[in-house]
Amino acid sequence: MDSGKLYSFAFKGLLTEEALDKAGRKSKDDFSAVWESETSKRLGLSLMDEEFVVKSRRMAVVYTAICSFENSVREFIAKKLLEEKGENWWDLCVKKEIRTNAENRKKSEKDVRWLTARGNSMIYYTEFGDLISIMAKSENWKFFEVHVGKIEWAKQIIETLEKSRNIIMHSGELAPTDIERVGMYIRDWIRQVG
């Protein structure tokens, strides 16, 4: 492709972006605000005690960070084991007890057909703490050591975040120092593991 055609293509793309913005294109942030407003109405948040709603919204931000972190660790483990052991990694790399618990959880949730499934991989049916057991299993550790460094470090992060998540999930509120710790651990993990 010659440079004139490439320039024309890129310039037309920029003009299209500008026209869409002027026409009122919704950004992902706008979508989130609209979705939150509509969902709040559907849930009847305006009927609830404002103090509880405010506290819950503060913790929702923290929960979002922890949930995103947890799912990124799940994906990291699943991708690494798929890459190293192939399609059958779940059976080869996960202890029977963890597999059985996850399979029972999936079956139990499947019996409630109106409830949305957690995910398309069995790793989404494990508990947060199980992720450490999967990484630390002697046959698996060599795949993770290069990324994680020390399993004790990863265990401390996951256990702390799991406890923090449980406080939020059971209607508790984390102190500002606890929130800072959650953020610190997530940032440390991302810097170390990616």
Question: Which residues does each predicted region cover?
Answer:
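Amphipathic alpha-helical interface elements
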Residues: 1-194
